[in-house]
Amino acid sequence: MRLSQFHLHTTKETPADAELVSHRLMLRAGMIRKLASGLYTWSPLGLRVLRKVEAIVREEMNRAGAVEVLFPTIQPRELWDATGRWEKFGGQLLKIKDRKEQEFCYSPTAEEAAAEFARQEINSYKQLPLNFYQIQTKFRDEIRPRFGVMRAREFLMKDAYSFHLTDEDMAREYDNMRAAYTRIFTRLGLDFRAVQADSGAIGGDASQEFHVIADSGEDSLAFSTGSDYAANVETASAAPPAPRAAASEAMQQVATPTQKTCEDVAQLLGIALQRTVKSVAVMTQAGFVLVLVRGDHAVNEIKLAKVPGLADYRLANESEIREHLGCEPGFLGPVNTARPVRVVADRDVAALADFVVGANVSGAHLVGVNWGRDLPEPETVADVRNVVEGERAADGGELRLARGIEVGHVFQLGSQYAQALQATVIDEGGKAAVMKMGCYGIGISRIVAAAIEQNHDDAGIIWPAPMAPWQVVVCVINPKQDPQVLAAAQALLDQLLAAGLDAALDDRGLRPGAMFADMELLGIPHRVVVSERGLAAGTFEYRARTADAAESLDKAALFSRLGH
């Protein structure tokens, strides 16, 4: 391919609203152009990258035994009413009417369509298991589309839906898909982690996310140095605490007139922050609850909501706090409460001895507090906190925290969607059985942006080789002035293509500096320059995208450097 015959339009200017590096570089490289808020046209260059990602995803899904289908993007309201998601999905669901006033939605995901297809097509357990996947445009009506294709309203997604007779078979396919996803992201050349996750609005029992590691990631991840353990901070856990030590201090009240935070109290008393206890007051349908975490820890809202009776909790207001504890916020504690309250203690708090809590008296705290002596053992002990960088993991390693961009998610859905849409089969006993479902998504267009967030420098994109628009670009100096140089460059291009390399010829006639800057901006892994001087010496100028300088190589050395 000659770039003079290819639409390539790079720019130096970046719109002011392009916040992320990937958004800026994709615009500057001419990969995308904005059509409307959250809607982007993919240029020929951008589409080359997108199709390369799509091809690897398709190959690995086929290898894993899934079969490709294509569901409609426009889906009838009846299906979404059956599962309750017509209302539950909220404002992100784009709802439309046809000329007959019948209601439809623009599919943000396709569990309903897949379950309906399975109901129509599968009637016997002998046909199971089956895994259908599609690569299809989706639409979610984001309130504030931002970050380019990272959070666009319209995006390209691979979504798969598997159907099973038993939970055990569903779990086997879940593992099969996790392995396929690992192969996909490995082949794409990305630094990623598969993490335990919360199932969120889609639901289900087991859930795992795949994140590309990047400083700009919206999600906070924790992973261990001792194994492949990794989890979203929503679900991550550290090693359990050591057994509680024996009490060694007497409880006494101390004045803390202006110290309302654990940090200030610890500094005043000259003690470690880990010995203080933070009291968080919440309200549930059942009443007032006091949640306790160590002063150096933070409550994890997702974990707390999973504690029995706290699914609907909210923070208590000041009047509710005064009613139950008899004091103002800043001095709260579980000792001497005005009314009986339920106490939920993080397991690290339950393991403390001689700790410090608010005295439920304005301007005072209690020191030397101990469970079983100064207050009852906590009614509920659970892991309800965020993990901390460097603490011990359950496998003995250290926990490390990183930011991640979610690019894939796998779920074990169970029977909720199949039950709602009456997707049943005849089982071995001749009875109707509701099928079990798994669902598995990959954000194909999001992968492109995530790869750039992870791989770039001041000059531009640094593509992992499998994703680059071309592996090699042959650059010609003064192609119009020297036909021999152009002919030699074309001959080299033909040899590169014959060797199986995805290569292009830059014959646009740009100044060398501008041409080389474009190649760096576009993230081309290998740049080869053909010039009159080089031909006279029998060499080519070669530079890898990440190299500090160019080098002169003869043809044999060049092909060796390119892995051929």
Curated annotation (Swiss-Prot):
Q: Name one GO cellular component term.
A: cytosol
Any one GO MF term held by the record is: aminoacyl-tRNA deacylase activity
Q: What is its main location?
A: cytoplasm
User: Could you mention a single GO BP entry for this protein?
Assistant: prolyl-tRNA aminoacylation
Instruction: Enumerate the catalysed reactions.
Output: tRNA(Pro) + L-proline + ATP = L-prolyl-tRNA(Pro) + AMP + diphosphate
InterPro entries named in the record: aa-tRNA-synt_IIb, aa-tRNA-synth_II, aa-tRNA-synth_II/BPL/LPL, Anticodon-bd, Anticodon-bd_dom_sf, Pro-tRNA-ligase_IIa, Pro-tRNA-synth_IIa_bac-type, Pro-tRNA-Synthase_IIa_type1
What's the EC number here? 6.1.1.15
* Keywords from the named record: Aminoacyl-tRNA synthetase, ATP-binding, Cytoplasm, Ligase, Nucleotide-binding, Protein biosynthesis
Q: Which CDD domains match?
A: ProRS-INS, ProRS_core_prok
Q: Classify the source by domain of life.
A: Bacteria
Presence of keyword Aminoacyl-tRNA synthetase: yes
Its annotated compartments are: Cytoplasm
**Is ATP-binding set as a keyword in this record?**
yes
- EC class of the enzyme, as a word: ligase
The domain comment in this protein's record states: Consists of three domains: the N-terminal catalytic domain, the editing domain and the C-terminal anticodon-binding domain.
Function as written in the Swiss-Prot or TrEMBL entry: Catalyzes the attachment of proline to tRNA(Pro) in a two-step reaction: proline is first activated by ATP to form Pro-AMP and then transferred to the acceptor end of tRNA(Pro). As ProRS can inadvertently accommodate and process non-cognate amino acids such as alanine and cysteine, to avoid such errors it has two additional distinct editing activities against alanine. One activity is designated as 'pretransfer' editing and involves the tRNA(Pro)-independent hydrolysis of activated Ala-AMP.
> What quaternary arrangement does the UniProt entry report?
Homodimer.
Family as reported in the entry's similarity comment: Belongs to the class-II aminoacyl-tRNA synthetase family. ProS type 1 subfamily.
Query: What is the recorded name of this protein?
Result: Proline--tRNA ligase
Protein source organism: Xanthomonas euvesicatoria pv. vesicatoria (strain 85-10)
